Design a protein with these regions (language model features):
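Phosphate-coordination/substrate-recognition cap region in phosphate-metabolizing enzymes
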Residues: 3-4, 11-13, 45-120, 187, ...
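Short coil/turn segments at beta-strand junctions that form active-site/ligand-binding loops
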Residues: 1, 64-66, 159-165
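Generic structural signal for well-ordered alpha-helical scaffold segments
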Residues: 52-59, 144-156
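Short, solvent-exposed loop/turn segments at secondary-structure junctions
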Residues: 9-12, 73-76, 96-97, 171-174, ...
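A polyampholytic, Gly/Pro-enriched intrinsically disordered region
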Residues: 108-123, 210-223
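Active-site-adjacent alpha-helix immediately C-terminal to a catalytic or transition-state-stabilizing loop
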Residues: 77, 85, 148-214
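An N-terminal RHG(E/S)-centered segment typical of histidine phosphatases
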Residues: 1-65, 210-223
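Short glycine/proline- and acidic residue-enriched helix-loop micro-motifs
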Residues: 33-42, 119-141
Length: 223
């Protein structure tokens, strides 16, 4: 049995985040910015091409009829639907991107000026930083807890039945998943990501045996 963890294909935010999404001052409320990120942001033309590549690649990894899970965000749902047509994915908030709450799409300058109390954590301990506002999540606590819950739910339905699974999710959520799946400190995974960020549409393939996950390979889309 294998678990394929997939970062969503390239979104319009990934391609052009500093030319429109991050404005100073931010033109939206925190709630509106979060809704924009969750419900509106779709894929670029390159992202659509990446989903075609995923459609060819994933069956070679997980075979036919895997269990498919996807976050509630549009860019992840679009990736799953285009990459695996004909398979109904289970949409789950457990795979959502880190919730940045009132900090969503704020520049660093505006963030530190508006919410100075959390500035040190954001600068030096980002994995511990809890974004201000309702629903704000830290990587080390809330995101880590969510992905742990996802894997606990996955175990009886797929792992124990020997059925492969695919999880379409997001950059920061994948950091949490890697920490749990590979039994590594969050700080180590974060530092590794700073050196080289996992590209959009990349696939982490884990072999599952006796309830343990072993990273088998990382497959990246064509440049």
């Amino acid at each position: 049995m294998r678990l394929a963890v997939v970062r969503h294909a390239e979104s319009v935010e990934n391609a052009d985040k500093y030319n429109g999404f991050y404005q100073d001052p931010r033109p939206w409320t925190g709630a509106a910015a979060h809704a924009l990120s969750r419900d509106v942001i779709g894929l670029t033309a390159r992202g659509f091409r990446q989903t075609a590549w995923l459609g060819e690649t994933l069956p070679q990894v997980v075979g036919d009829g895997p269990a498919v899970f996807v976050s509630q965000y549009r860019r992840a749902r679009d990736t799953a639907e285009l990459a695996m047509p004909g398979i109904t994915a289970e949409v789950t908030g457990l795979l959502n991107e880190q919730h940045y709450a009132d900090a969503t799409y704020m520049t660093m300058r505006e963030l530190f000026e508006t919410f100075p109390d959390g500035a040190d954590d954001r600068r030096h301990r980002k994995h511990l930083w809890t974004p201000p506002g309702k629903g704000g999540e830290s990587l080390a606590v809330e995101v880590h807890g969510r992905v742990t819950a996802f894997l606990a739910l996955l175990a009886p339905g797929a792992v124990e039945a020997g059925r492969s699974a695919v999880a379409f999710t997001h950059h920061t959520t994948i950091l949490g998943l890697r920490a749990v799946l590979e039994q590594r400190p969050v700080t180590e995974v974060v530092e590794e990501s700073r050196a080289r960020k996992l590209p959009n549409a990349a696939v982490l393939v884990y072999r599952v045996a006796a309830g343990r996950y072993e990273l088998e390979q990382v497959i990246e889309p064509p440049a």
